Every structure is written in structure tokens, then in C-alpha cells.
UniProtKB/Swiss-Prot annotation:
Modified-residue entries (Phosphohistidine), positions: H230
Reactions performed catalytically: nicotinate + 5-phospho-alpha-D-ribose 1-diphosphate + ATP + H2O = nicotinate beta-D-ribonucleotide + ADP + phosphate + diphosphate
Species annotation: Bordetella bronchiseptica (strain ATCC BAA-588 / NCTC 13252 / RB50) (Alcaligenes bronchisepticus)
A GO cellular component annotation in the UniProt record: cytosol
PTM info: Transiently phosphorylated on a His residue during the reaction cycle. Phosphorylation strongly increases the affinity for substrates and increases the rate of nicotinate D-ribonucleotide production. Dephosphorylation regenerates the low-affinity form of the enzyme, leading to product release.
Listed name of the protein: Nicotinate phosphoribosyltransferase
Keywords from the UniProt entry: Ligase, Phosphoprotein, Pyridine nucleotide biosynthesis
Top-level EC class: ligase
Pfam family, one: NAPRTase
EC number: 6.3.4.21
Protein task: Catalyzes the synthesis of beta-nicotinate D-ribonucleotide from nicotinate and 5-phospho-D-ribose 1-phosphate at the expense of ATP.
Family: Belongs to the NAPRTase family.
Amino acid sequence: MVCRNVSRQQFRAIMIITSLLDTDLYKFSMMQVVLHHFPAAQVEYRYKCRTPGINLRPYLDEIRAEVHELCQLRFTSEELDYLRGLRFIKSDFVDFLGLFHLPERCIFIGEGEQPGEISITVKGPWLHTILFEIPVLAIVNEVYFRNTRRNPDWEEGRKRLQSKMNLVLDDPALADFRVAEYGTRRRFSKVWHEEIVSTMKARMGVHFAGTSNVLLAMRHGVLPLGTMGHEYLQACQALGPRLRDSQVFALEVWAKEYRGDLGIALSDVYGMDAFLRDFDMYFCKLFDGARHDSGDPFVWGERLLEHYRANRADPRAKTLVFSDSLTFPRAIELARQFAGRCKVSFGIGTNLTNDLGHEPLQIVMKMVRCNGQPVAKVSDAPEKTMCDDPAYLAYLRQVFQLPPA
């Protein structure tokens, strides 16, 4: 499916989410852990738009209608067979997905407190609500842009994409450069998203590592990519034995589930200092690498390589994954910085799937509670910290020896 074949009427009329696979792989890898280890956990997610001045209220009914259709979807036999073929997916999980649908009773969509703001809350069993986040954000994005950008400049988007790819293709020194597409949640539209993936596959060859989107990976025969997200480590604040040990608990449960597979640890739920304190020699040797998602990526990478050396793990055998607001020029800088010192991989999201010449929305949907207890993400970028309980956030900072906000 490519954008040149889609009329304006089709662009507006196509149902946005038509498959439950139209989400990121890490949702399934986390969901499998939830099924096997935390099936009774109750959670709450909350939507937030970080872009000022955005008025989404005129589109509330449209968003509700799309979410209603999302909740009617079931996995098809073809989709279940595809998931069953992934080496780390277990048969009982696929059997569960065969019975699964998103429960409409668990999502609440209304007006927000500020002018133009909307409110989206998801509340219910973690196992049954974990798949809401990505498609709901994709729906909000596409509804907004199909109403405010009625004649998308596809050609401008194609020119921008080609210029990005040329930065890699025209430089022989970047023969080992690998980039993945990570842009489902903030994409301009699903048809544009698919064109991005098909174009990168066709033109970038071995430089294109794959996509986080499971549906597009299945359709285009590319590798689906992803391991764990912030919500997993956040939930473990409430599910583990005590708060101070929650990061270690999360990594140990992950290792117990995947036995060395899907071995990229997320480093920024409590900041890099706290991550390195917990990421001891055992984890350094057990996990394949770590993912950067906030703070200075160059400083982060240097600190992680030094940490590996201090723990007698060869950095050259480890993978550093960079995914924080990446652009191609920044990814190339990082590739040059760490060339020959470790393996590097890059996940680029919004800069690929929503770069047609206008400002993309900065929207998120984060877990705020688990089993009735507040949970928080305290990243290396202060603006990404999200928690609805200031007292809990202050306590968490004290427990993990983090500086005050």
C-alpha cells in the first residue's frame, strides 16, 4: 500500500487500525511476561499531549468511533501463525491471544481540564489493557492530521526520506550502519507508515534492520524488533518485593522468562546512575546490551562501555541501541563515535513516519498506577518524568539516590 494510490477520500475513510498486530513488538514480549508472571496485576494508563496549543476536542467523536472499532478486532489465524513462528513466543501465549480482544469498558475518552485538551484513561487488568497504548496513540495522531492536513505533501515526504537514506547509502564508511523504523505511535498515517517501511526495505538493503511494527514486519518480510518498554519496569515498582530492588527484580523476571533471548535492557526508568548501580556483573554478562531513551547519548554510551569493562564484559560483544528522538545525522554521529568499540543499532521513529514538513504531535500514554499504587518514570530528561503523585515521586528519588527535581 503506497500513498500515491490513495485518494483524499480514501485517506479519510479508511479505518485506522484494522489489525491487532498493528502495534510494536515489545508490547507482545511484555504481555507474555505479564501472562506468565503477573496475570492478576491491575493498572492505569493516562494520555498526555506535550505539544502546546493543540485542540483535539473537535475530533473526540471521531477518536471514540475509531477506538470502538479497535475493540471489535480479533487476531486472525494468519496473524496467530506468524506470532507462533517467532522463536521467543510460547504456544500458551498464542492460545491466549486467540481468545483476546481489547475491552472497551476499560478505556475512557473525554474532555481534558485545559482548553482544547482531551482526556484518555485506560484502567483494568494489565494483561487485557497492555495493547491499548500504541494503536490509541496512532488513532489520535491520524485523526488529528487527516483533519488538519487534508492534502498531505507526499512528494515532500518522499524527498525527505530519500535524502536521509542517501546519507547512509552514499558513504562507504557506513557499511555496517543499521537502522530500524520505530514510528508506529506518532506516524502521520498508516498508509504513509507502510510506504516508509516498503521503501526502506527496497532501497536500503542490509542497512535496514527491520521495524518495531509487527503487522508491517509480517507483510513485508522484515525483522520485527523490540524487547521491553518503560511500563514493564514501572509496574515492577508495585509488583516486586520492595521499591529499591524493583529494577533488579524486573531484569531477573525478564531473564527467567526469556533465558537470554530479547536481551536489551532499558536503562532510563530511574536514570543512568541508578541503572549502573543495579546492572552488575551478572546482568552485564547475561544481557546482550542496553537501550538509550533519554539524556545525552554520547555520554550514556561512554559510561556504559566503561561499566562493561569494569565488570569484565567485553564491550565489543555488546549492543548499544539508541532510540531517543533520533535523526539520521545524529545516528551517523553516534555510529562514528562507537565504531569498532561495540555493536550499535538505531531505532528512528517520528523523524521517519511523521516528517512531511509540519510539526508532529508529542503525545504519550504512560502507566501511572499498578495495583492501586503510584508508579513513575524518572528519566535522564526531566521533561519525560511522568507521575501523578508528587509524594511518591519524591520517595522514589530518595530510594534511588536521585537528585530533587
